[in-house]
């Protein structure tokens, strides 16, 4: 017993010295795991001899010391192969060569330069999880170590080796565990990466991907139904769209440069009139006709939290594609949908079309295009 106690004291003293030294050399960390391995051997032998204590230290069960000893052997041999590679002379901290780091995703790889990313599930800041994006990853390939770069996209955290992507964190699977829908946002500092649901819609409601084409049964379209031109004549009521900018000079004849759009009588965005009013018409006879403008708008409809997240993303990434965005609002009528609304305004139809061609909406957010007749004072 005295011999085991003496050897154990020497081993633990070496461990304390290594911890205090806090070296960045790989050889020191290999020595650290050798000491842990030797400590497990001594404790295992002491338990076999029937000892429950060595001084003030409790002797663990045989299975505990055996398992920990096997782990120490694994780490020692792994670090020795890393030492003999091209990366053996790089600075390595004790934390980077720890067992915990070895088993942190991606497992059985060494990693450096970790950065925390936040994933908000269901567009809800209160339902967020943090993950570590490793920018440098060391992967063992057959008989040698390979240094690769870590990446991040909407799907998850991954690295590329041999031309193949290996995801070690899949955000879709995480969304199934922590969210109520397959929708999430990845926040990296001030940058936001959208979930696939925000990039490509598969539901029947609209996803902004191009100019909208109307069907005979609905005012919304799917991504596959979007076309590059608007229909000139349909079974719906067709009216002439006004020029979108207020004329600076005398009124001009717009008959030769008229855009035709189809608007459903029941779903007009302009609540004051079911039809679109051209600039040459003004219901207020006491004012100059030139001051009446029909402003192009897009009305978004969906869950209030999703709309708030979307509005924040629009201001952060696409603020040049629209003029203004309203706060989240609702109709007060009791027989209307409980969905929230956000209204976007544009300088002209060209800016609105550029917005529709560029921005992608979450699948549960629909939109309607139209005009809002404003009386400019």
Swiss-Prot record:
Pfam families: PPV_E2_C, PPV_E2_N
Region DNA-binding domain, residue ranges: 294-377
GO BP: DNA replication; DNA-templated transcription; regulation of DNA replication; viral DNA genome replication
Alphabetical keyword list: Activator, DNA replication, DNA-binding, Early protein, Host nucleus, Phosphoprotein, Repressor, Transcription, Transcription regulation
GO cellular component: host cell nucleus
Cited InterPro entries: E2/EBNA1_C_sf, Nucleotide-bd_a/b_plait_sf, Papillomavirus_E2_C, PPV_E2_N, Reg_prot_E2, Regulatory_protein_E2_N, Regulatory_protein_E2_N_1, Regulatory_protein_E2_N_2
Localization in the cell: Host nucleus
Residue spans of biased composition, Polar residues class: 251-260
PTMs per UniProt: Phosphorylated.
GO molecular function, a single term: nucleotide binding
Major site of localization recorded for this protein: host cell
Region (Disordered), start-end ranges: 241-260
UniProt region (Transactivation domain), positions on chain: 1-200
Family: Belongs to the papillomaviridae E2 protein family.
Function according to Swiss-Prot or TrEMBL: Plays a role in the initiation of viral DNA replication. A dimer of E2 interacts with a dimer of E1 in order to improve specificity of E1 DNA binding activity. Once the complex recognizes and binds DNA at specific sites, the E2 dimer is removed from DNA. E2 also regulates viral transcription through binding to the E2RE response element (5'-ACCNNNNNNGGT-3') present in multiple copies in the regulatory regions of the viral genome. Activates or represses transcription depending on E2RE's position with regards to proximal promoter elements including the TATA-box.
Subunit text: Binds DNA as homodimer. Interacts with protein E1; this interaction greatly increases E1 DNA-binding activity. Interacts with protein L1; this interaction enhances E2-dependent replication and transcription activation. Interacts with protein L2; this interaction inhibits E2 transcriptional activity but not DNA replication function E2. Interacts with protein E7; this interaction inhibits E7 oncogenic activity. Interacts with host TAF1; this interaction modulates E2-dependent transcriptional regulation. Interacts with host BRD4; this interaction mediates E2 transcriptional activation function.
Name used for this protein in its record: Regulatory protein E2
